[in-house]
Amino acid sequence: CHPDQFNVLASLGQAQVEKTIKELNHHGWLMDMLGAHRDYRCPINIHVNNAKGDPAEIADRFMMNLYKCDESVRSRLVVENEDKGIWTPSLLAKHFTIPITYDNLHHKCLPDGLTEDQAYRLCYRTWHRKGYFKPLFHYSESHPDKSNPRSHADMPTEIPIDGGYSFPVDYDIELKWKDDAIRAIETCPKN
């Protein structure tokens, strides 16, 4: 599950943090009602969404506020690399002990000196810090007809990387024509 970007656990504003905790607790409750596992097999994925200040202080504030959330959230919450700001895979891995959802388009928009393969591997390893969990990664491509590289394409032109390593990963396909895009990826010949 991927709650909206207005959720900012690292906010300096207490009202925003309280709204975020309430929203995340609702997602955790709903996942419990659906019978979802209370671990990283059923992640709740959010962005840090705060680039103002020292990364260590931001991460500490994020984690302190995460501990105010219900167990249904704490046991599932993961963070995602961002397409703007500061939160790249390397910085997330340095400051967070929870898994990182790798988003290939975000990495292209906000590279951190790591190749796509290196960023993929780094994020993959974070899912195994507390046991074995199959990572949930995001796949998308830039829209070819838009000037903003962050705009998501309608359909894929390639298939998500697996690094050639046969790493088991679940992908959330973040392309505009979701079902058609998934079918196109499933029928693509693999090299």
Name the predicted role of every residue range:
Residues 1-99:
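Active-site acidic/histidine proton-transfer and metal-coordination neighborhood
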Residues 97-107:
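Conserved mid-sequence domains
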Residues 63, 89, 105, 117-120:
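A general structural signal for well-ordered alpha-helical packing
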Residues 98, 110-191:
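Histidine-acidic metal/acid-base catalytic patches
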